[in-house]
């Protein structure tokens, strides 16, 4: 559905997050005088009233009859379509769409393909990969948009003039189904990996996987690029796409710490400001994408060395009193925490802070790995902290210190004490969302920076968003 199709319709917005605010602005730009209803919280209503929009109605209670009363409801991506309320409303006739769906429908050619659109998804690494892709496309002299889940909703760039040559678009699992439902197809879809995450939103592991992979299984991009080292991805068959791979020995892959194209050594990952083996894989994904787009990836690879890392993603805040403070607040799965630990274990003493909102993710994989490569200390916190603590307690004796904190300040204090005068790495890599304690992972990362004694404003901006 194109945004022009909303003219004269009864339209509502559900939610008032970043994506919904972008949808509001896009709707108002198209239809300045058309009535619109917003379902939001009481706290959000106060902010919205300041807009002084005479044809905007604000409702702080949402129900099945009210949702079903509209022709179209533009839903915030954070609201699950599998929630009882959304399911009941759909059964009653409510029609939900998302902002991502509106953008893709607006930009599709007659064959359904959005020219120059490269969509990146995966359980972890997608923000860094998308930003690095935009960085290298710009290094090649191509006007490129960096947008999507990374921090700039696509609807903020609905009708840019002039249009960029390429769109580097990060998509969450909440948004991939939006693309699939739009009827449009990205020119290239890149899937980095798939681990269980957001199980509360999707209602189970298999549905999460299906929704995530709908970007390639349902949207049918002309080119699909997948990680050959991921078992779930390696088994995919996509007959309607030109299927390509990275992390294969005859293509882009890492050996030791060097990026190779087949047998050709291309780039030493030690020169790139992205620590960890998983980031070597992300670099390969980007270079394989450039190659699939017809660009000289080997020649462009050295430009990765001046990439500016993103905040909250294995971000080195700085060193104070012998302690290196590392902010990996984006980490919302145990797999991500393990990848973060791999950057430091065996090199420096590490105290890691884990735990947060409990959405039912299994931490047994973390427990199994942690006994083979152990940090100095683990501090648990948050709603799932007691669960992680109980899982690790039988394994800790004689191997690593294990502490329980009531919140992030307490966790930081415990970790500092554990590291002591010898210092080491104090790593925030929670492996869980921030809900309940913070608005989002960004706010959690900012609080961590404050506790570490660093200016949160300096460390929290993402460079390169938008068109350049």
Swiss-Prot record:
PANTHER family: UDP-N-ACETYLMURAMOYLALANINE--D-GLUTAMATE LIGASE (PTHR43692:SF1). GO terms for molecular function: ATP binding; UDP-N-acetylmuramoylalanine-D-glutamate ligase activity. It is found in: Cytoplasm. It catalyses: UDP-N-acetyl-alpha-D-muramoyl-L-alanine + L-glutamate + ATP = UDP-N-acetyl-alpha-D-muramoyl-L-alanyl-L-glutamate + ADP + phosphate + H(+). Disulfide bonds: none annotated. It comes from the Bacteria. This is UDP-N-acetylmuramoyl-L-alanine--L-glutamate ligase. GO terms for biological process: cell division; cell wall organization; peptidoglycan biosynthetic process; regulation of cell shape. Pathway: Cell wall biogenesis; peptidoglycan biosynthesis. It is an enzyme of class 6 (ligase). Cell wall formation. Catalyzes the addition of L-glutamate to the nucleotide precursor UDP-N-acetylmuramoyl-L-alanine. InterPro entries: Mur-like_cat_sf (IPR036565), Mur_ligase_C_dom_sf (IPR036615), Mur_ligase_cen (IPR013221), MurD (IPR005762), MurD2 (IPR043687). Its EC number is 6.3.2.53. Gene3D superfamilies: Mur ligase, C-terminal domain, Mur-like, catalytic domain, NAD(P)-binding Rossmann-like Domain. It comes from Xylella fastidiosa (strain Temecula1 / ATCC 700964). One of its GO terms (cellular component) is cytoplasm. Keywords: ATP-binding, Cell cycle, Cell division, Cell shape, Cell wall biogenesis/degradation, Cytoplasm, Ligase, Nucleotide-binding, Peptidoglycan synthesis. Its main location: cytoplasm.
């Amino acid at each position: 559905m194109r945004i022009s199709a909303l003219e004269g319709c009864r339209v509502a917005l559900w939610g008032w997050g970043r994506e919904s605010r972008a949808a509001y602005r896009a709707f108002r730009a198209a239809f300045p005088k058309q009535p619109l209803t917003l379902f939001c919280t009481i706290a959000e209503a106060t902010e919205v009233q300041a807009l002084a929009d005479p044809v905007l109605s604000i409702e702080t209670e949402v129900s099945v009859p009210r949702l079903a009363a509209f022709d179209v409801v533009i839903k915030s991506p954070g609201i699950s379509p599998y929630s009882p309320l959304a399911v009941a409303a759909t059964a009653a006739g409510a029609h939900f769409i998302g902002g991502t769906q509106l953008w893709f429908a607006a930009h599709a050619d007659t064959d359904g393909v959005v020219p120059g659109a490269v969509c990146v998804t995966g359980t972890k690494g997608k923000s860094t990969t998308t930003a690095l892709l935009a960085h290298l496309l710009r290094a090649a002299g191509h006007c490129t948009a960096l947008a999507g889940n990374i921090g700039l909703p696509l609807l903020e760039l609905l009708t840019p003039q002039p249009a960029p040559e390429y769109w580097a678009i990060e998509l969450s699992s909440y948004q991939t189904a939006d693309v699939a439902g739009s009827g449009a197809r990205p020119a290239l879809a890149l899937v980095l990996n798939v681990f269980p995450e957001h199980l509360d939103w999707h209602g189970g592991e298999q549905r999460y996987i299906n929704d995530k992979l709908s970007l390639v299984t349902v949207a049918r991009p002309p080119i699909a690029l997948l990680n050959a080292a991921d078992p779930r991805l390696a088994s995919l068959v996509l007959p309607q796409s030109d299927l390509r791979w990275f992390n294969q020995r005859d293509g882009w892959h890492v050996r030791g710490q060097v990026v190779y194209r087949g047998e050709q050594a291309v780039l030493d990952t030690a020169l790139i400001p992205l620590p960890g083996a998983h980031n070597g894989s992300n670099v390969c994904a980007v270079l394989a994408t450039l190659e699939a787009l017809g660009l000289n990836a080997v020649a462009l690879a050295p430009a990765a060395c001046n990439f500016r890392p993103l905040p909250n993603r294995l971000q080195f805040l700085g060193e104070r009193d012998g302690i290196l403070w590392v902010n990996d607040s984006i980490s919302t799965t145990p797999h991500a925490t393990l990848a973060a630990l791999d950057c430091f274990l065996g090199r420096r003493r590490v105290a890691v802070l884990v735990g947060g909102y409990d959405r039912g993710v299994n931490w047994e994989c973390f427990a199994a790995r942690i006994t083979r490569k152990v940090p100095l200390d683990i501090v648990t916190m948050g709603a799932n902290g007691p669960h992680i603590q109980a899982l690790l307690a039988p394994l800790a004796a004689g191997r690593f210190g294990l502490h329980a904190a009531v919140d992030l300040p307490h966790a930081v204090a415990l970790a500092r004490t554990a590291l002591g005068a010898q210092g080491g790495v104090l790593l925030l890599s929670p492996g869980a969302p921030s809900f309940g304690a913070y608005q989002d992972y960004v706010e959690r990362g900012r609080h961590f920076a404050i506790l570490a004694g660093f200016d949160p404003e300096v460390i929290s901006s993402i460079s390169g968003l938008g068109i350049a």
